[in-house]
């Protein structure tokens, strides 16, 4: 869904809102693709947070190198 949305989205500050409106109104099933993308991204981050919670529960934070790699991956995912 991200590639399809990127084909129609403009990141310019003057036209960003109108490009989102264009996706929702003029693109066939654009509203559905936008909602699927938003819900999929939210579910992805919920899974990441559950994985972090599992690591906290089982004490994986004691493995400093592994935990630091995970933190870096989380920050890269959020960029």
UniProtKB/Swiss-Prot annotation:
Record text on cofactor binding: Binds 2 heme b groups non-covalently.
Keyword Iron in record: yes
Membrane topology: Multi-pass membrane protein
Keyword Mitochondrion applies: yes
GO cellular component, one term: mitochondrial inner membrane
Domain of life of the organism encoding this protein: Eukaryota
Residues that hold heme b b562 according to the record: 37
Similarity section: Belongs to the cytochrome b family.
Miscellaneous: Heme 1 (or BL or b562) is low-potential and absorbs at about 562 nm, and heme 2 (or BH or b566) is high-potential and absorbs at about 566 nm.
Keywords: Electron transport, Heme, Iron, Membrane, Metal-binding, Mitochondrion, Mitochondrion inner membrane, Respiratory chain, Transmembrane, Transmembrane helix, Transport, Ubiquinone
Cofactors (names): heme b
Binding residues annotated for heme b b566, in chain numbering: 51
Annotated function: Component of the ubiquinol-cytochrome c reductase complex (complex III or cytochrome b-c1 complex) that is part of the mitochondrial respiratory chain. The b-c1 complex mediates electron transfer from ubiquinol to cytochrome c. Contributes to the generation of a proton gradient across the mitochondrial membrane that is then used for ATP synthesis.
GO molecular function per UniProt: metal ion binding; ubiquinol-cytochrome-c reductase activity
Subunit structure: The cytochrome bc1 complex contains 3 respiratory subunits (MT-CYB, CYC1 and UQCRFS1), 2 core proteins (UQCRC1 and UQCRC2) and probably 6 low-molecular weight proteins.
SUPFAM superfamilies: Transmembrane di-heme cytochromes
Single Gene Ontology BP annotation: mitochondrial electron transport, ubiquinol to cytochrome c
Cell compartments where the protein resides: Mitochondrion inner membrane
The protein's name: Cytochrome b
Annotated Gene3D superfamilies: Cytochrome Bc1 Complex, Chain C (1.20.810.10)
Transmembrane segments: 1-7, 31-52, 67-79
Cited InterPro entries: Cyt_b/b6_N, Cytb/b6-like_sf, Di-haem_cyt_TM
């Amino acid at each position: 869904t991200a590639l399809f949305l990127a084909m129609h989205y403009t990141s310019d500050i003057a036209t960003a809102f109108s490009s989102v409106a264009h996706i929702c109104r003029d693109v066939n099933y654009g509203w559905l693709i936008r909602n699927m993308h938003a819900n999929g991204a939210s579910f992805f981050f919920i899974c990441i947070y559950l994985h972090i919670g599992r690591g906290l529960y089982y004490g994986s934070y004691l493995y400093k190198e592994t935990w630091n790699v995970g933190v870096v991956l989380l920050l890269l995912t959020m960029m």
